[in-house]
Amino acid sequence: IAGNDRQRFREMMFKWWETGVAYNKMDSIDGTPNKWFQRWLSHPAFDEYWQKMAPYKEDFSQIDIPVLSIDGYYNDSQNSGLYYLREHYKYNPNAEHYLIIGPYSHFGAHRNGSEEINGYKVDADALINTKEITYQWFDYIFNNAKKPKILKDKINYQVMGANEWKSD
């Protein structure tokens, strides 16, 4: 609705909550209607419109590139990242798809997390440099370098309260 302008988005959200305006009118709250937002709302189901934009069902079997997903337990959008992981393995059991997941929010997973989230004091072990790990990942796939050390197995998760990482 507001592009990358986070402050504008916050202001629009608060105004929407305060006024009770219908959700499909939220893009007009600040006088700047958004044709993309309206187009998306006109497709509330996972119909052909959305299916053309993302892998769907058997499409996952054709994904034959290494994939690294970094996600967080507190990420309100994590269901999409984990959906792609599950579907990739479902249709391509030999996929080279790795997951790093820990106590991170939506943005925290890509910004090294934070020492506290929703009142929970995050374990020191969980505060990893995800940007550096991403660079290491690219070196691994493009330059034949070693795989990032944290990727012990395909699924790598931080055990909250135990100050440790585990892998499956």
Please report, for each region that a protein language model flagged, where it lies by residue:
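Accessory cap/linker subdomain of secreted extracellular hydrolases
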Residues: 1-61
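Alpha/beta-hydrolase-fold serine-hydrolase catalytic core, especially in secreted/extracellular enzymes
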Residues: 35-39, 43-52, 62-65, 71-78, ...
